[in-house]
Amino acid sequence: MLFMKYEGEIAIGPVHPTMLEPHRLRLFIEDEIIKEAELVIGVNYRGIELIMEGLPPEKISILSEKICGICSHIHVWCNVTVTERGCDIEVPERAEYIRAIVEELERLHSHMLLFGHAFEVLGFETMAFRAFMIREPIMQILGEITGGRAQYSCPIIGGIRPRCNIKESKIPALLERLEKFEENLKKLLERTVNDPMIMSRIKDVGVLDKKTAKKLHALGPTARGSGIHSDMRKMGQVPVYDNFEFEEIVFDDGDVFSRLAVRFYECFESVKIIRQGLKDLPNLDKRIYNPNYELKEFKPIDVYNEAQRGQVYYSYGLDENGRVRQVKIRTPTATNLACMEAILPGHHVSDAELIIASCDPCFTCTDRMIVVKENKI
């Protein structure tokens, strides 16, 4: 009996159970194999850069934090760094250390969120809940240090907020909880790599080769999963990280497993950085804020940092009235999504959302641009 091939389109989203954030995925299929894919973003467009134009730098630092709830700290850190460099503002070393500690805690909770989401997409609910259970102590630590679990408001121009100063009496307890987190993470990693069902879904699936990754400018763990060194912390863009010993994690296979493995092992490196930072804090000067600064006019300057998903870029200048001009913000998800869109053809429909999830997309960070064609949005 002859069966005719089915050719058609499957539209997923913008709201779907496998999506943490809204986007629209169009899959053009032949039977159950993807022949072409189109990823549509922009559902959450809010025009952040336009809103920032003409505001004082103190206000845009608050606004930048609202760009994303998962990586809010890195946005504020980059934002205030532009003003600090443009106005030659000295930041106390203790403040820089605490900024880095909070960022690495944020990296841990973000990576654990991805693991939970990835297991959920795979259909392994038990592993998903385990990932979130391991993540919870990190959220509690962030809440204790900053007063918030999602919006931390830690960096300010010239330092950090007083409430975010880490008391030396709390350091031993924090180190103990980090050690427990590390033990639980090792168990989760061991359980993952030794489960043949999980590995069959993520090994040799969604392969992004090094050439394509370079061509489409993959960033962060997505690039490092394809053998590309891309960590801004190791490239001298964030001077405070020169005080810490840690490794840049790179895998060469470029598949879903490699992208997840980079994040797994990055968690151990983040714990290493936090541990060093906490142990060094008692030896640093007690100052956390430099109030003796003056805003001055400067042309747009560039600032880079390494967010959980890759390179974050901020640029703006101040006019003669101390108002922000020419704001540009670039987050890593846009180029990483282009990579995922390029490698979807040839895969089974059931692998589509998993492949996209493997680059850990943050659509809230990405949706700041809108396309206008013939005066129509």
Swiss-Prot record:
Q: By its UniProt entry, which InterPro entries does this protein fall under?
A: ComplexI_49kDa-like, NADH_Q_OxRdtase_suD, Ni-dep_hyd_lsu, Ni-dep_hyd_lsu_Ni_BS, NiFe-Hase_large
Looking up PROSITE patterns in the UniProt record yields: NI_HGENASE_L_1
Listed GO MF terms: ferredoxin hydrogenase activity; NAD binding; nickel cation binding; oxidoreductase activity, acting on NAD(P)H; quinone binding
Q: Does the keyword Transport apply?
A: no
Q: Does the keyword Oxidoreductase apply?
A: yes
Alphabetized, the UniProt keywords read: Oxidoreductase
Which PANTHER family is this protein grouped with? FORMATE HYDROGENLYASE SUBUNIT 5-RELATED, HYDROGENASE-4 COMPONENT G
Family (UniProt): Belongs to the complex I 49 kDa subunit family.
User: What is the protein name stated in its UniProt record?
Assistant: Uncharacterized protein MJ1027
